[in-house]
Every structure is written in C-alpha cells, then in structure tokens.
C-alpha cells in the first residue's frame, strides 16, 4: 500500500540542512474542506444524503483518533510561517486543538447536516466487507500544535462547526467523478441492521 512508504522525514532533513535556504517544516494533519481530492467526508455524507438509518463503523476504527484541520485554517498557518521570520528553521505541527475519534467525527458531520440516523459500532467480523477498515487502528494519529500557537500566535479563524458545514456543502456539490460503488453495499448493510434489530 502507498501509505506504507509515505514518509517525508528525508525531505525535511534535506531542506533543513541547507544553510542558504531558511526553510520551515509544517506537519499538517488530514486536511478537509473545499478542494479535498481524497473526499474524506464522502463515505459518511453520501449515506446521510441517501437517508440511511445508520453509518456502520468497525469498533476499533470508531475509537481511533485522527487529527484534522480545515483547509482555510491550514492555509492561514502556512501564510503565518511565510511572513514570520521567527518560523525560519522551525518544525511545527498544525492541527485542530481537539482531536476527535472517528465516531465523534461522523456524529459532528451528522449534526451539522441534520442527519437523524445513528452511528453503530461493530466488530470487524460482523461488518460487510465494504466497511471493514483493513488497518490497525490501535495507534492514534495526534499532533500537538502548542508550539506554533505559542511561538507564532496561530489559532483557528474558522470554528470547527462552521468548517464542517462549509466542507459538507462543498462535498455534497462535488462528489468524486469516479468512486467504487461497492463502498455503498446498502443491501449488505440492511442485512446487518435487520440482524441487530432481532437481537
């Protein structure tokens, strides 16, 4: 998988070791919002727009915490480093102050969109194949952005609720041109929901 070889440390070292280039390293989180080519909200939003009664999450993935940042706020952090001489030679982590679990993330998207469904956590073996995470979610991905806040005065201009709202509006108007329809096997999901209702 591409993510197994995804590492920018060597590039960071190359830039920071060049004395003639006053480089600054910014380590960004998962960036969401307008122009998100990975369409991070899409799997959840499509189900909400399709008025699905539930978003089913693998239990380990539901608890996983991953840092995020709204694209507008991340752009401000980048601009701050460009114009502030103090940033030269520095390494800064940038992320929202609070890191949500995947479940909390889906619930926040749902709240902003007025979705009346619920998030249901299930073990991997009880989920349809299209919803099995296929990753080890034991390790959270959390960034501490204290340094850029203290040294450069960074703070989010766009609050999280407003950011999610703007991102959701963009995502709903800009579905990916191509996507795997197998991601949305509603028949299999309905079978799981029917089984749960009988339990």
Which stretches of residues belong to each language-model region?
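Active-site Tyr-X1-5-Lys
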Residues: 1-25, 40
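Structural element of the ATP-grasp superfamily
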Residues: 11-15, 48, 148
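Flexible, glycine-rich beta-alpha linker
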Residues: 21-45
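Conserved loop-to-helix N-cap of the C-terminal "lid" that shapes the substrate pocket in Rossmann-like
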Residues: 25, 65-75, 91, 99-103, ...
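Glycine-rich Rossmann NAD(P)(H)-binding loop
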Residues: 33, 57-64, 92-99, 136, ...
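A conserved pocket-lining segment of Rossmann-fold NAD(P)-dependent short-chain dehydrogenase/reductase
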Residues: 47-69, 77
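Mid/C-terminal beta-alpha module of Rossmann-like enzyme folds, strongest
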Residues: 77-140, 145, 178-199
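A contiguous, mid-protein "functional segment" used to position or interact
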Residues: 149-180
């Amino acid at each position: 998988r591409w993510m197994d070889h995804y590492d920018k440390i060597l590039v960071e070292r190359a830039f920071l070791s060049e004395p003639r280039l006053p480089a600054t390293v910014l380590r960004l989180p998962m960036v969401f919002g307008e122009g998100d080519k990975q369409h991070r909200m899409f799997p959840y939003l499509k189900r909400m727009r399709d008025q699905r009664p539930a978003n089913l999450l693998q239990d380990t993935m539901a608890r996983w915490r991953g840092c995020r940042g709204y694209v507008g706020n991340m752009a401000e952090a980048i601009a701050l480093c460009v114009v502030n001489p103090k940033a030269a030679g520095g390494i800064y982590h940038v992320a929202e102050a609070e890191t949500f679990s995947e479940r909390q993330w889906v619930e926040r998207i749902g709240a902003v969109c007025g979705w009346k469904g619920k998030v249901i956590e299930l073990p991997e073996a009880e989920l349809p194949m299209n919803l099995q995470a296929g990753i080890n979610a034991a390790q959270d991905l959390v960034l501490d952005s204290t340094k850029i806040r203290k040294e450069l005065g960074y703070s989010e201009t766009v609050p999280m609720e407003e950011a999610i709202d703007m991102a959701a509006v963009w995502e709903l108007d800009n579905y990916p041109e191509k996507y795997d329809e197998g991601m949305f096997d509603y028949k299999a999901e309905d079978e799981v929901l029917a089984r749960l209702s009988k339990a």
